[in-house]
Amino acid sequence: MMKVLVVFALLVTLISYSSSEGIDDLEADELLSLMANEQTRAKACTPRYYDCSHDRHSCCRSSMFKDVCTCFYPEGGDNKEVCTCQQPKHLKYMEKATDKIKNLFG
């Protein structure tokens, strides 16, 4: 029960923060310039379901969370490890719930 309350409080905080319009123009401009500089510095990310075995920290971000490089051994007797960028199920459900709440109130 406590975990549910903590997750709910976290979601409410994220939604209220993302929908707040308290950033003034100067801070918004500074933030945009910092983000532009960061994106020019960043290397290309690995899209979801693509091979990430070369760099396990290169997975792209979804709308809220970063995908995780998940490694597994495929069925069929091949002992070669396969790694792909995937979104964990709990994060997928949190994104869907947040989107539904935003659509409901926004």
Curated annotation (Swiss-Prot):
<keyword id="KW-0800">Toxin</keyword>
<keyword id="KW-1015">Disulfide bond</keyword>
<comment type="similarity">
    <text>Belongs to the neurotoxin 19 (CSTX) family. 02 (D7) subfamily.</text>
</comment>
<keyword id="KW-0964">Secreted</keyword>
<dbReference type="InterPro" id="IPR019553">
    <property type="entry name" value="Spider_toxin_CSTX_knottin"/>
</dbReference>
<feature type="disulfide bond">
    <location>
        <begin position="71"/>
        <end position="83"/>
    </location>
</feature>
<dbReference type="Pfam" id="PF10530">
    <property type="entry name" value="Toxin_35"/>
</dbReference>
<protein>
    <recommendedName>
        <fullName>Toxin-like structure LSTX-D7</fullName>
    </recommendedName>
</protein>
<dbReference type="InterPro" id="IPR011142">
    <property type="entry name" value="Spider_toxin_CSTX_Knottin_CS"/>
</dbReference>
<keyword id="KW-0960">Knottin</keyword>
<feature type="disulfide bond">
    <location>
        <begin position="45"/>
        <end position="60"/>
    </location>
</feature>
<feature type="disulfide bond">
    <location>
        <begin position="52"/>
        <end position="69"/>
    </location>
</feature>
<feature type="signal peptide">
    <location>
        <begin position="1"/>
        <end position="20"/>
    </location>
</feature>
<dbReference type="GO" id="GO:0090729">
    <property type="term" value="F:toxin activity"/>
</dbReference>
<dbReference type="GO" id="GO:0005576">
    <property type="term" value="C:extracellular region"/>
</dbReference>
<feature type="propeptide">
    <location>
        <begin position="21"/>
        <end position="41"/>
    </location>
</feature>
<feature type="disulfide bond">
    <location>
        <begin position="59"/>
        <end position="85"/>
    </location>
</feature>
<keyword id="KW-0732">Signal</keyword>
